[in-house]
């Protein structure tokens, strides 16, 4: 094989965004090793530039047709670019909110940025992976980096406990996923590429269903679907808050990207079975997530159970399996990025100024910090689906797609649990705007004078303003976003029941195709 042929099969240009991030994290790591804490003044901003560059390089890739690279292991199409951009944006928002937070804990910013960028690269590779080994390596890159981030504030016993729980449960889920993948490898006769596996296993069998169950169990851990959610509340409460923000958006987006790619490519012969399983997961997640959130006293635990319920809403679009369903799923993940990052930015600001995340301590916040109260209120109301905020349009699109596909029960349950979620979101908003001085919490009474001059607070302010604006306007100005997600879905043939690029290539190279 000559170099020209090798270069053509590698198509390394498709991973230019990931390459930029790898170079960025290496520079940040070397700077931290050489300069130590002095590098903390500029490495976060260098990481922001690297993420911005990675996102910018996706724009020309968006105009190109679907391209297979690395001998069929990776595909760059509109769907993968959408999820890669979503994960990169979540990392960008996480960095903006983490500079002041990590600096205040006394930990190294350079090391934090390196691990966060590593997790981002792993998640972005998952979005386009189409080969079993490639998928598992990318998944473990994201997972191991996430474990390290969870326990990053090692002086905090809660962070250590959260990291240990996350590691143990995550290792078990990885083993389950790997076992399901190994079953696919054996049943298909040694194939590792997902389209080849689908062609080799074109009929339903008991072994294929068993493999499906194991694979779904591994994926469900990533998206915090009930009953694979046990790690979520404890990890969200104990981990550093910026890490929780990334796990709730970036890691969850990678999990849904893997679910779409893996299940639609490798399991077309058992579509009814995996749709039934995800229907059950959606029902359990919507009910448990939103009902248990009612009883929480910590903002981080409330948002943890909220994220479980939100995953249930997203699964409605996945279950119906139509173009509108997939598009509504992508649209909701996009608006969820802004409203959830905005909510966590507000939680970080409040905890930096008061040292607590208890819901009761937010009482009377409006009198001391109107901007923070407004931002948190808009983000929480958007998560609840109050019009005209972005979350309302996201849920309307999801429920409309489900209703159009005949999933009436799921849609009605989604509406009911959305009403439940509005109660616990509005409870926080109502507490913040109490007017009586005697109702003000002790933390708010001792609230420091609002200042943005300290190191790391200005990026936090930028992140807050950007997410709140996006949360407020994304629904009203939704047409460009609708076009974006529709293009991402239309470009993927397996979502429209057409032959995929990989399937066509495999058929052409197989002996049957040549004859």
From Swiss-Prot:
Q: Which UniProt keywords apply?
A: Membrane, NAD, NADP, Plastoquinone, Quinone, Thylakoid, Translocase, Transmembrane, Transmembrane helix, Transport
EC number, UniProt record? 7.1.1.-
Q: Which reaction does it catalyse?
A: a plastoquinone + NADH + (n+1) H(+)(in) = a plastoquinol + NAD(+) + n H(+)(out); a plastoquinone + NADPH + (n+1) H(+)(in) = a plastoquinol + NADP(+) + n H(+)(out)
Q: What InterPro entries does this protein's entry cite?
A: NADH-Q_OxRdtase_suN/2 (IPR010096), ND/Mrp_TM (IPR001750), Ndh2_N (IPR045693)
Topology relative to the membrane:
Multi-pass membrane protein
Question: Which residue ranges does UniProt annotate as crossing the membrane?
Answer: 14-34, 42-62, 79-99, 109-128, 132-151, 167-187, 206-226, 240-260, 274-294, 302-322, 330-350, 374-394, 396-416, 462-482
Q: Does the keyword Transmembrane apply?
A: yes
The protein's predominant localisation is membrane
Q: Name one GO cellular component term.
A: plasma membrane-derived thylakoid membrane
Gene Ontology MF terms:
NADH dehydrogenase (ubiquinone) activity; quinone binding
Where does it localize? Cellular thylakoid membrane
One GO BP annotation is: ATP synthesis coupled electron transport
Q: What does this protein do?
A: NDH-1 shuttles electrons from an unknown electron donor, via FMN and iron-sulfur (Fe-S) centers, to quinones in the respiratory and/or the photosynthetic chain. The immediate electron acceptor for the enzyme in this species is believed to be plastoquinone. Couples the redox reaction to proton translocation, and thus conserves the redox energy in a proton gradient. Cyanobacterial NDH-1 also plays a role in inorganic carbon-concentration.
HAMAP family membership: NDH1_NuoN_1
Name by which UniProt lists this protein: NAD(P)H-quinone oxidoreductase subunit 2
Organism, as annotated: Thermosynechococcus vestitus (strain NIES-2133 / IAM M-273 / BP-1)
Gene name tied to this protein: ndhB
